[in-house]
Amino acid sequence: MFKSGFVTIVGRPNVGKSTLLNAIMKEKLSIVSCRPQTTRNNIQTILTEDNYQLVFVDTPGIHKPKHKLGEYMVKSASDAMKDVDLVLFLINPDEKPGRGDLFIIEQLKEVKVPVFLVLNKIDENPQEKVAETLKTYSELMEFEEIIPISALKGKNIDLLKELMFKYIPEGPQYYPEDMIIDQNERFIVAEIVREKALRLLSEEVPHGIAVEILQMKRNEKGTYHIEGNILCEKNSHKPIIIGKGGSKLKKISQYARQDIEAFLQSKVYIRLWVKVKEEWRDNQSLLKELGYKNMK
């Protein structure tokens, strides 16, 4: 008997959805940064084992939108809860249910498929706090399963996989067994660069940055030559991203190259520039060019 199903992971921004997906896949597939809203696009990730295939839709965190990109991210996350076989609602024990959580719960109540409550970061919280959070959420909604985990340390991830297998239906293998992600290489490269920029810039530049891959060519020796722009919204942000004598941009390129080489399994040369695009997050045509395809 072979089983297959589509699974979506929802939760407030910065709750650890991408980290959980990475723990399940044991691969660095989804951009992980300590800052909220770093996952901007639905990424279908495929886990294939001998007797089942799980297709994960990694979504942006649900939050109140402030611009066109924000509207897209919220719609993307909400749409992902439709036409799936299982929903994982990820929370942190050290945070009481806020308006965002209550908003998600109201949507989950309309879902016709099993919903798991997954408590992340249990290794960072006392058992009393975890128990208190469980009780609070259990009173708000009935869940098919409640699983405490540590995505970062991999605790109870195998248990979570077993329970997901239990609830998904019998079905075909939708993707080849060696396929682990349905986004193209250019998209992944852009996400890796953006992650490094977010990490290195810390609080110096807000979320108003994107990465535009201008060229990605592979020569006869298998070496990739990549060129791209880091887009920012203000002229004042440009020197911050570049850094003194180009030091910050050089570090972004260096750290990105290491991960890109691991991803592509090839040697990589990468050149990056910084370009100002004012209010790019409200520019629908540019958002489509950057890969946010469902903009209207």
From Swiss-Prot:
GO terms for cellular component: cytosol; plasma membrane. The keyword RNA-binding applies. Residues 3-170 form the Era-type G domain. GTP binds at residues 11-18, 58-62, 120-123. Residues 37-41 are annotated as: G2. Residues 201-278 form the KH type-2 domain. It is a peripheral membrane protein. Residues 11-18 are annotated as: G1. Residues 149-151 are annotated as: G5. HAMAP family: GTPase_Era (MF_00367). An essential GTPase that binds both GDP and GTP, with rapid nucleotide exchange. Plays a role in 16S rRNA processing and 30S ribosomal subunit biogenesis and possibly also in cell cycle regulation and energy metabolism. Belongs to the TRAFAC class TrmE-Era-EngA-EngB-Septin-like GTPase superfamily. Era GTPase family. Monomer. This is GTPase Era. It comes from Clostridium botulinum (strain Loch Maree / Type A3).
